[in-house]
Amino acid sequence: MSSFEERERAEEAKFAFDAELRFKAEARRNKHLAYWACDEIGIESANDRANYLAEVITADLTEAGPEDVVVKIKADFEAHSVQIDEATIRTKVAEFDELAKREVIDEAK
């Protein structure tokens, strides 16, 4: 095998590894967001929290990026008369995104 082929395989492996880390970080971000939203809405039982997490995960499958999750959480806050605006939700998305990335990278070490 030539050094070019070895380098190509290494780059492909790194790309796959990075994609897996991104996927795990997005899933972790959504988990943090869902549980934060549960706290704000007042969802307390473990079963209800798990169901809400599943709803957030399903919402995230609609389109790339966190936009669909923001829309879902905002609608849920409005439905439960929670006075948290979209800007605050987006701030939480950014915070939890960074937290999730750090957690996933630390676990991968």
Predicted regions and their residues:
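A charge-rich, low-complexity, intrinsically flexible signal that marks solvent-exposed coils, linkers
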Residues: M1-K109
